[in-house]
């Protein structure tokens, strides 16, 4: 596999298991949310999610850096973004967390048109309840995954095997072998002679 295959197509094929792609997207969103917005907290806090948490994926949690309570919503769509589904989640968030939540990060694998009436209506609904909405969508999510290579490995099977990887691993192996490795020592075998026909050396 080529390096840098962090795409939504790769995400779907790499996460096609019994739980399904949507659950894996929720997991990815939770990890990005934690690394991006909670890692600077002085007190380590873990994201807690009740079964079928209403409106947002987990309970609101304090962002100590900005002194506000934040949450996140993960929306994975197969086709176009469904603004009605986003609105339903926003309504539940207002109902359950008004006065307890300052900002929702909306992770969505599709691009959202923030100037359309549907989105503006969702934003107004939340703003009227004192909750801001910050969309993190499509390629921005992929860029964040590239920032954390271990997430690329886990969710996109992007193991970073490249020419440089082979060169680095060979150098490490040579260093481990130390004086036991001698580049001048080379045994010519029947297999290497047969291969040299194809390699033209």
What is each stretch, according to the model?
Residues 1-188, 194-201:
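Mixed-charge (Asp/Glu-Lys/Arg
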């Amino acid at each position: 596999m080529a390096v840098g295959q962090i795409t939504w197509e790769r995400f779907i094929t790499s996460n096609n298991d019994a739980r399904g792609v949507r659950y894996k997207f929720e997991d990815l969103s939770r990890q990005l949310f934690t690394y991006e917005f909670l890692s600077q907290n002085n007190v380590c806090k873990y994201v807690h999610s009740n079964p079928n948490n209403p409106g947002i994926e987990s309970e609101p949690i304090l962002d100590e850096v900005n002194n506000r309570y934040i949450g996140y919503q993960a929306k994975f769509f197969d086709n176009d973004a469904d603004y009605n589904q986003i609105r339903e989640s926003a309504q539940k968030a207002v109902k359950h967390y008004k006065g307890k939540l300052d900002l929702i990060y909306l992770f969505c694998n599709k691009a959202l048109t923030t100037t359309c009436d549907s989105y503006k209506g969702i934003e107004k609904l939340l703003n009227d309840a004192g909750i801001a909405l910050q969309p993190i969508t499509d390629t921005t999510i992929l860029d964040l995954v590239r920032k954390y290579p271990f997430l690329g490995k886990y969710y996109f099977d992007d193991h970073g095997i490249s020419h440089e990887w082979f060169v680095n691993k060979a150098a490490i192996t040579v260093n481990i072998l130390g004086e036991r490795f001698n580049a001048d020592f080379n045994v010519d075998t029947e297999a290497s002679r047969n291969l040299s026909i194809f390699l033209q050396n």
